[in-house]
Amino acid sequence: MSLSHINTIQVTSGADFNKHHKGTIFYKFLNDDLVHHNFKYTLGLNTDIIKFNTDTRCSAGGLYFCEESKCHLYWRNYGKKLALVKIPNDAVVCIENNKFKSNKIIIKEITDFNDVPDKFWIKIRRKD
């Protein structure tokens, strides 16, 4: 599976995604109220209430997340909480440029920015 596609959207199963990304850590940034685009995130399984959209990039119809190495692109824009994300094997995942979306994600933990260890911030610092 190549992540270099720019004009096409790759779609894969959660099981294949997990196999290909074994050992990769995924995150989502959240607002204080845990609501983003009218969806309220909770610990545990989160399933989008909008029909999953595999046709359009950066669109409704999917719950977005990114890998740790791309966190520097998003941390300033989406609130002051960091959620650790896992993907269920029965999910559908779209691979977009620098991010992913899925019809369902599992939030394992939610941490306020003030409580996130310094090593995380050092690790995600953009290296140009």
Task: State where each predicted segment sits.
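ADP-ribose/NAD+-binding catalytic cleft of ART/PARP-like enzymes
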Residues: 2-60
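Generic low-polarity alpha-helical segments
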Residues: 1, 63-64, 125-128
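Active-site-proximal loop/hinge segments that shape catalytic or ion-binding/gating pockets
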Residues: 111-128
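ADP-ribosyltransferase catalytic core
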Residues: 49-113
